[in-house]
Swiss-Prot record:
Gene Ontology BP, a term: positive regulation of heart contraction
Stretch forming the signal peptide: 1-20
Modified residues (Asparagine amide): N31
Keyword field contains Secreted: yes
Name the UniProt record assigns to this protein: Pro-corazonin
Length: 171
């Protein structure tokens, strides 16, 4: 009976320690790095300066300033959209096809090979443009290829054009 209580107490203690470490890690408190908000003399500007850089900020800071200044407004909008959602492969392929040079994207490898990168001029497709980013937005409901935006964003190209079934829409 004593061994059972000892084992149970050790297991409970282990669970508490693991939860405490997970909590500290989620708050960024590992290695003695406490949040500056706990002291009453800290200002919001100093706490913003002490925040760690996110992956998006690191990627943006890794781009050379000359590279950012040479981008067109539509290319900057595409880069901002890629930084918001790096898993969108359409945006990533357009971004890589527009600038296949290694010096503009030093973190990316040069192993990207696409049929779209054959030197064509950079044109941001209208369905990727955000109207709030002052790049013109979408002028009409149909795209340059004659399809509507809903058809362009559809997963399956062979389905009907009507949206009678809500499961056909992209969430």
């Amino acid at each position: 009976m004593l061994h059972t209580r000892t084992i149970a107490l050790l297991l409970v203690g282990l669970v508490v320690l693991v939860n405490a470490q997970t909590f500290q890690y989620s708050r960024g408190w590992t290695n003695g790095k406490r949040s500056p908000l706990s002291s009453s003399s800290s200002s919001p500007s100093s706490s913003a300066a002490m925040e760690p850089l996110t992956a998006n900020q690191l990627l943006a800071s890794a781009l050379s300033s000359g590279g950012l200044n040479s981008l067109k407004p539509s290319e900057k909008a595409l880069l901002r959209r890629f930084l918001r959602n790096p898993c969108d492969l359409r945006v990533a392929s357009l971004l890589a096809a527009a600038h296949p040079t290694k010096e503009l994207f030093p973190l990316a490898g040069n192993s990207f090979d696409s049929a779209e990168s054959a030197g064509a001029a950079f044109v941001l497709p209208p369905f990727l443009m955000d109207p709030d980013e002052s790049n013109g937005g979408i002028g009409g409901s149909n795209l340059a290829n004659g399809r509507s935006m809903e058809d362009e964003l559809r997963f399956k190209r062979g389905t009907a054009t009507g949206f009678s079934d809500h499961r056909q829409k992209i969430a």
